[in-house]
Amino acid sequence: PYYLNYFEPQLSLPQNVDRLMFANDGKLKDEYDRLFASVFSSPEDMKAIVECIGRRHSGYMRKEISSFTGIEDSGNLSDKLKALVASNFIIEYAPFGDSVRNTRYKLVDPFCRFYQTYIKGRHNLPEDFWTQNMDSQAVISWRGIAFEEVCLNHISQIKKGLGIAGVSTEQSSWIQRGDNNNEGTQIDLIIKRKD
């Protein structure tokens, strides 16, 4: 809700995104760095973890995170992952049918996903980048991932809508890799009842 105060009601959503994120003086252009610096005592490590996890839609296991970030697989990494989960930047889950040993960490913060996909490392983008690319295949694919993340961030509301708010559940995804004989299949959200 705080960021909505920056929106100009006479502009379209894409125009507002351009004005806030892609304009040279955009109010949210540097928000990613400010956000991590204001929330965490070691913002660079936390950004490294989030950026690592954000590289793959299904996320990574902790040993992979340690390997990619150079942060030792120890209590220090555990504390950082717990802080990111508690802050709702990432979730921890075991893919459907896998053991807890295969626990993964997945990026679910929409702002971080947007920043990593469209801002980080990209310089000299036109100030109307979002307006010009709204119908591109890349943005359409990103919207699908963003919708999945909205669902993951609102499990309690989904459960309420399904009439199972009081039932203990686990959330996960399921992927069947394709091979020479079968196509691959993916289910983005499975809500498994524990009753």
What are these regions (language model features)?
Residues 70-87:
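Short amphipathic alpha-helical interaction segments
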Residues 56-68:
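Short acidic, hydrophobic short linear motifs in intrinsically disordered regions
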Residues 41-58:
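Short amphipathic alpha-helical interface segments
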Residues 32-42, 64:
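Short amphipathic alpha-helical boundary/capping segments
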Residues 85-96:
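A short, conserved structural fragment
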Residues 1-34:
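Amphipathic alpha-helical "lid/sensor" segments that cap RecA-like P-loop NTPase cores
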Residues 96, 103, 108-195:
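A cross-kingdom feature that marks ATP-driven nucleic-acid transaction machinery
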